[in-house]
């Protein structure tokens, strides 16, 4: 049986991923607001559905709109035929969905996107919930996804909000990293950072972790555009 590879519909990012997101792989996408995180993983979910495989989009931000789905899918019925959207209201509900992934995968789920993995986690932090408790639970959720990805070939795409990096010698001003950086990077097989690139609509994708990266040196970088119909 051929390995399932889910394309992003963006040639530049597919190049970074080696053709698309492969089954059994966890991808972390992070970047500031407006860099295209949601659009990227939504395109992957729609492509998976359009290929005839079940896809789940977990909308933790609660701002995914039907109009955006129609614009990206071009109104093609097959693009949404196998797509399910879940909207957890809090971090506990996010945990429940993730704990159900093995059941979903055994029933044919091929791809899950969680947008964002850290939004509801951050909301709990703002309420004064113990960071230790939240970090332990976030790590557990990531471990569950890694196990399901390995055992069932589930392709996973996570997005994360960002925070300013703590200053280090030689660090440029304004550098950011994913919220819960250590946890998410540990479990992710591939990490892509999205950045604004100066021109209107132009964005930059930087591969920070992946099988093709070894040793020090410049990271692979590609440019793409955000349009009404998605990223290209």
Which functions belong to the PLM regions below?
Residues 1-2:
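Charged, amphipathic alpha-helical linker segments immediately N-terminal to NTP-binding catalytic cores
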Residues 8-20:
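Pre-Walker A adenine-sensing motif
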Residues 13, 29, 69, 83, ...:
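Conserved RecA-like P-loop NTPase ATPase core
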Residues 19-21, 47-51, 76-78, 103-107, ...:
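Conserved catalytic network of the ASCE P-loop NTPase/AAA+ motor domain
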Residues 22-100:
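Conserved P-loop
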Residues 59, 87, 116, 196, ...:
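Flexible glycine-/small-residue-rich
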Residues 88-93, 98-183:
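P-loop NTPase motor core
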Residues 148-232:
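Phosphate-binding/switch region of NTP-binding enzymes
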